[in-house]
Amino acid sequence: MSSGGLLLLLGLLTLWEVLTPVSSKDRPHFCHLPADPGRCNALSEAFYYNPVQRKCLKFRYGGCKANANTFKTIDECKRTCAA
């Protein structure tokens, strides 16, 4: 194979890696934790990843001491956990 062909193959493999969604085995373990409102009573809006529905959902967050499957924005949740 020529060096141009190898370069093209390398470019395509790199693009495939970047565009391939996160698989369930690659998700951080905390993405499988349930929504956790925490122990405080602030009741603000937050997001968590629901592995059954395979998407990020909104929930009421108390403001402190929740698990790691708690995100301030839906985009942060999607970047971390969603496939």
From Swiss-Prot:
Instruction: Tell me where in this chain the BPTI/Kunitz inhibitor domain is found.
Output: 31-81
In which tissues or organs does this protein occur?
A: Expressed by the venom gland.
Q: Which cysteines are joined by disulfide bonds?
A: 31-81, 40-64, 56-77
This chain's source organism reads Drysdalia coronoides (White-lipped snake)
- State the PROSITE patterns in the record: BPTI_KUNITZ_1 (PS00280), BPTI_KUNITZ_2 (PS50279)
Pfam families given for it? Kunitz_BPTI
Q: What is this protein called?
A: Kunitz-type serine protease inhibitor 18
Q: What is its main location?
A: secreted
Q: List the lineage, top down.
A: Eukaryota, Metazoa, Chordata, Craniata, Vertebrata
